[in-house]
Protein backbone atom coordinates (compact mmCIF):
# COMPACT_ATOMS: atom_id res chain seq x y z
CA UNK A 1 0.00 0.00 0.00
CA UNK A 2 3.02 2.33 -0.07
CA UNK A 3 2.10 3.22 -3.64
CA UNK A 4 -1.56 3.74 -4.46
CA UNK A 5 -3.61 4.91 -7.37
CA UNK A 6 -3.74 8.67 -6.85
CA UNK A 7 -4.58 9.87 -10.33
CA UNK A 8 -8.33 9.82 -9.77
CA UNK A 9 -8.56 11.90 -6.64
CA UNK A 10 -6.89 9.67 -4.06
CA UNK A 11 -4.04 10.42 -1.68
CA UNK A 12 -0.96 8.48 -0.65
CA UNK A 13 -1.23 7.43 3.00
CA UNK A 14 1.24 5.32 4.88
CA UNK A 15 0.42 1.64 4.60
CA UNK A 16 -0.46 -0.51 7.60
CA UNK A 17 2.57 -1.77 9.49
CA UNK A 18 1.19 -5.23 10.23
CA UNK A 19 -0.83 -7.90 8.50
CA UNK A 20 -4.25 -6.92 9.83
CA UNK A 21 -6.66 -7.06 6.90
CA UNK A 22 -8.95 -4.53 8.53
CA UNK A 23 -6.16 -1.97 8.38
CA UNK A 24 -5.51 -2.83 4.73
CA UNK A 25 -9.20 -2.36 3.91
CA UNK A 26 -9.30 0.97 5.72
CA UNK A 27 -6.22 2.18 3.84
CA UNK A 28 -7.78 1.11 0.54
CA UNK A 29 -11.07 2.84 1.27
CA UNK A 30 -9.20 6.05 2.03
CA UNK A 31 -7.70 6.22 -1.46
CA UNK A 32 -10.05 4.44 -3.84
CA UNK A 33 -12.85 6.33 -5.60
CA UNK A 34 -16.19 5.51 -3.91
CA UNK A 35 -17.55 3.61 -6.92
CA UNK A 36 -14.44 1.43 -7.11
CA UNK A 37 -14.55 0.76 -3.37
CA UNK A 38 -18.19 -0.32 -3.69
CA UNK A 39 -17.30 -2.66 -6.55
CA UNK A 40 -14.38 -4.22 -4.69
CA UNK A 41 -15.97 -4.44 -1.26
CA UNK A 42 -19.61 -5.08 -2.11
CA UNK A 43 -21.63 -8.21 -2.75
CA UNK A 44 -24.88 -9.12 -4.43
CA UNK A 45 -28.42 -8.63 -3.17
CA UNK A 46 -28.60 -8.00 0.56
CA UNK A 47 -24.98 -9.21 0.88
CA UNK A 48 -25.98 -12.07 3.19
CA UNK A 49 -23.49 -14.46 1.59
CA UNK A 50 -20.74 -11.86 1.89
CA UNK A 51 -21.40 -11.51 5.61
CA UNK A 52 -21.62 -15.28 6.06
CA UNK A 53 -18.28 -15.77 4.32
CA UNK A 54 -16.60 -13.26 6.59
CA UNK A 55 -18.18 -14.82 9.66
CA UNK A 56 -16.89 -18.23 8.60
CA UNK A 57 -13.33 -16.93 8.29
CA UNK A 58 -13.62 -15.13 11.62
CA UNK A 59 -14.17 -18.52 13.26
CA UNK A 60 -10.78 -19.76 12.06
CA UNK A 61 -7.98 -19.38 14.60
CA UNK A 62 -4.46 -20.65 15.11
CA UNK A 63 -3.83 -22.90 18.10
CA UNK A 64 -0.23 -22.51 19.29
CA UNK A 65 1.82 -25.52 20.34
CA UNK A 66 4.16 -25.11 23.29
CA UNK A 67 7.02 -27.17 24.70
CA UNK A 68 7.35 -29.13 21.46
CA UNK A 69 9.92 -28.98 18.68
CA UNK A 70 8.41 -27.01 15.79
CA UNK A 71 11.70 -26.36 14.01
CA UNK A 72 11.03 -28.79 11.16
CA UNK A 73 7.40 -27.91 10.44
CA UNK A 74 6.69 -27.05 6.81
CA UNK A 75 3.62 -25.52 5.17
CA UNK A 76 4.58 -26.85 1.75
CA UNK A 77 2.09 -28.84 -0.26
CA UNK A 78 1.52 -30.09 -3.79
CA UNK A 79 -1.51 -29.29 -5.96
CA UNK A 80 -1.95 -30.77 -9.44
CA UNK A 81 1.70 -31.76 -9.39
CA UNK A 82 2.95 -28.24 -8.61
CA UNK A 83 4.81 -27.34 -5.43
CA UNK A 84 3.29 -24.63 -3.24
CA UNK A 85 5.22 -23.10 -0.34
CA UNK A 86 1.95 -22.48 1.54
CA UNK A 87 -1.45 -24.22 1.31
CA UNK A 88 -3.27 -21.25 -0.21
CA UNK A 89 -3.02 -19.06 -3.28
CA UNK A 90 -4.42 -15.88 -4.83
CA UNK A 91 -8.04 -16.24 -5.90
CA UNK A 92 -9.29 -14.79 -9.21
CA UNK A 93 -10.45 -11.16 -9.08
CA UNK A 94 -11.20 -8.95 -12.06
CA UNK A 95 -9.60 -5.64 -12.99
CA UNK A 96 -6.78 -5.28 -10.45
CA UNK A 97 -5.77 -2.05 -12.18
CA UNK A 98 -8.81 -0.39 -10.61
CA UNK A 99 -6.78 -0.42 -7.39
CA UNK A 100 -3.21 -0.03 -8.64
CA UNK A 101 -1.64 0.75 -12.02
CA UNK A 102 0.51 -2.39 -11.90
CA UNK A 103 -2.62 -4.49 -11.56
CA UNK A 104 -2.30 -8.25 -11.88
CA UNK A 105 1.44 -8.15 -12.52
CA UNK A 106 1.95 -6.94 -8.94
CA UNK A 107 -0.45 -9.56 -7.58
CA UNK A 108 1.20 -12.35 -9.56
CA UNK A 109 4.62 -11.15 -8.44
CA UNK A 110 3.54 -11.23 -4.80
CA UNK A 111 2.26 -14.79 -5.21
CA UNK A 112 5.54 -15.75 -6.84
CA UNK A 113 7.58 -14.27 -4.00
CA UNK A 114 5.50 -16.28 -1.56
CA UNK A 115 6.00 -19.41 -3.65
CA UNK A 116 2.34 -20.08 -4.29
CA UNK A 117 -0.33 -20.13 -6.99
CA UNK A 118 -1.78 -17.09 -8.76
CA UNK A 119 -5.20 -17.51 -10.36
CA UNK A 120 -6.01 -14.85 -12.96
CA UNK A 121 -9.51 -13.77 -13.85
CA UNK A 122 -10.73 -13.97 -17.43
CA UNK A 123 -11.33 -10.25 -16.91
CA UNK A 124 -7.76 -9.47 -15.87
CA UNK A 125 -6.49 -6.02 -16.78
CA UNK A 126 -2.98 -7.27 -17.62
CA UNK A 127 -2.09 -9.64 -20.45
CA UNK A 128 -1.34 -13.31 -19.97
CA UNK A 129 2.27 -12.65 -20.98
CA UNK A 130 2.65 -9.83 -18.44
CA UNK A 131 1.27 -11.95 -15.62
CA UNK A 132 3.38 -14.95 -16.62
CA UNK A 133 6.49 -12.77 -16.66
CA UNK A 134 5.83 -11.63 -13.10
CA UNK A 135 5.87 -15.05 -11.42
CA UNK A 136 7.59 -18.38 -11.85
CA UNK A 137 4.97 -20.01 -9.63
CA UNK A 138 1.89 -21.97 -10.68
CA UNK A 139 -0.59 -20.00 -12.77
CA UNK A 140 -4.27 -20.83 -13.19
CA UNK A 141 -6.99 -19.09 -15.19
CA UNK A 142 -10.60 -18.57 -14.13
CA UNK A 143 -13.11 -18.50 -16.98
CA UNK A 144 -16.82 -18.06 -17.55
CA UNK A 145 -18.56 -20.22 -20.13
CA UNK A 146 -19.04 -17.51 -22.75
CA UNK A 147 -21.77 -17.76 -25.35
CA UNK A 148 -19.08 -17.08 -27.96
CA UNK A 149 -17.31 -20.44 -27.87
CA UNK A 150 -14.68 -19.43 -30.44
CA UNK A 151 -13.60 -16.54 -28.24
CA UNK A 152 -13.48 -18.82 -25.22
CA UNK A 153 -11.33 -21.36 -27.09
CA UNK A 154 -8.95 -18.60 -28.19
CA UNK A 155 -8.61 -17.27 -24.64
CA UNK A 156 -7.80 -20.74 -23.32
CA UNK A 157 -5.25 -21.39 -26.06
CA UNK A 158 -3.41 -18.13 -25.40
CA UNK A 159 -3.39 -18.75 -21.66
CA UNK A 160 -1.96 -22.22 -22.20
CA UNK A 161 0.77 -20.78 -24.42
CA UNK A 162 1.65 -18.37 -21.60
CA UNK A 163 2.12 -21.23 -19.17
CA UNK A 164 -1.19 -21.21 -17.31
CA UNK A 165 -1.54 -24.80 -16.15
CA UNK A 166 -5.13 -25.16 -14.94
CA UNK A 167 -8.63 -23.88 -15.70
CA UNK A 168 -10.98 -22.74 -12.94
CA UNK A 169 -14.47 -22.81 -14.46
CA UNK A 170 -17.10 -20.62 -12.78
CA UNK A 171 -20.42 -22.46 -12.89
CA UNK A 172 -22.48 -20.75 -10.17
CA UNK A 173 -23.62 -17.70 -12.14
CA UNK A 174 -26.50 -18.87 -14.36
CA UNK A 175 -28.10 -15.52 -13.55
CA UNK A 176 -26.15 -12.27 -13.23
CA UNK A 177 -26.57 -11.05 -9.68
CA UNK A 178 -27.88 -7.61 -8.78
CA UNK A 179 -25.29 -5.60 -6.89
CA UNK A 180 -26.96 -2.61 -5.20
CA UNK A 181 -23.72 -0.71 -4.55
CA UNK A 182 -22.83 -0.83 -8.25
CA UNK A 183 -26.32 0.30 -9.23
CA UNK A 184 -26.19 3.16 -6.76
CA UNK A 185 -22.86 4.41 -8.12
CA UNK A 186 -23.70 3.66 -11.79
CA UNK A 187 -20.43 1.74 -11.79
CA UNK A 188 -18.58 1.86 -15.10
CA UNK A 189 -15.06 0.80 -15.99
CA UNK A 190 -12.73 3.71 -16.79
CA UNK A 191 -11.32 3.71 -20.31
CA UNK A 192 -7.82 2.86 -19.11
CA UNK A 193 -8.89 -0.32 -17.27
CA UNK A 194 -9.86 -3.08 -19.69
CA UNK A 195 -10.14 -6.84 -19.94
CA UNK A 196 -7.12 -6.95 -22.22
CA UNK A 197 -7.23 -10.69 -22.89
CA UNK A 198 -10.68 -10.49 -24.50
CA UNK A 199 -11.59 -8.93 -27.86
CA UNK A 200 -12.37 -5.29 -27.19
CA UNK A 201 -15.49 -5.55 -29.34
CA UNK A 202 -16.97 -7.65 -26.52
CA UNK A 203 -16.25 -5.05 -23.86
CA UNK A 204 -17.94 -1.89 -25.14
CA UNK A 205 -20.90 -1.81 -22.76
CA UNK A 206 -18.62 -2.26 -19.74
CA UNK A 207 -17.31 1.25 -20.44
CA UNK A 208 -20.66 2.89 -21.23
CA UNK A 209 -22.09 4.84 -18.30
CA UNK A 210 -25.85 4.86 -17.66
CA UNK A 211 -27.32 6.55 -14.60
CA UNK A 212 -28.73 4.06 -12.13
CA UNK A 213 -27.31 1.04 -13.93
CA UNK A 214 -24.14 -1.00 -13.59
CA UNK A 215 -22.21 -1.22 -16.84
CA UNK A 216 -20.50 -4.38 -15.57
CA UNK A 217 -23.85 -6.03 -14.86
CA UNK A 218 -25.22 -5.11 -18.26
CA UNK A 219 -22.09 -6.35 -20.00
CA UNK A 220 -22.16 -9.65 -18.11
CA UNK A 221 -25.73 -10.30 -19.13
CA UNK A 222 -24.79 -9.87 -22.77
CA UNK A 223 -21.89 -12.33 -22.62
Question: What do the PLM-derived regions correspond to, one by one?
Answer:
Residues 2-82, 187-223:
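An N-cap/entry alpha-helix motif that binds or orients negatively charged groups
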Residues 33, 90, 111:
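Residue-level signature of catalytic and energy-coupling elements of molecular machines
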Residues 42, 96, 100, 120-121, ...:
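Glycine- and other small-residue-rich loops at beta-strand/loop junctions that grip anionic moieties
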Residues 76-87, 95-108, 123-136:
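N-terminal active-site wall of soluble small-molecule enzyme domains
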Residues 88-91, 116-120, 139-143, 167:
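Hydrophobic faces of well-ordered beta-strands that scaffold small-molecule active sites
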Residues 95, 109, 113, 130, ...:
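Alpha/beta enzyme core
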Residues 122-123, 171:
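Short secondary-structure boundary segments
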Residues 123-125, 145-149:
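Short beta->alpha connector loops
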Amino acid sequence: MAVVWVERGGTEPAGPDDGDLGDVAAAARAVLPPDVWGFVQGGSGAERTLRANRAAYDKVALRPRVLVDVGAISLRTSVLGADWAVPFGVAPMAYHRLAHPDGETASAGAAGELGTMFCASMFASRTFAEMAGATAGPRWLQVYYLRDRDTLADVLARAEQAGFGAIVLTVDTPHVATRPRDLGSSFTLPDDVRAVNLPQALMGTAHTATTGRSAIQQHSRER
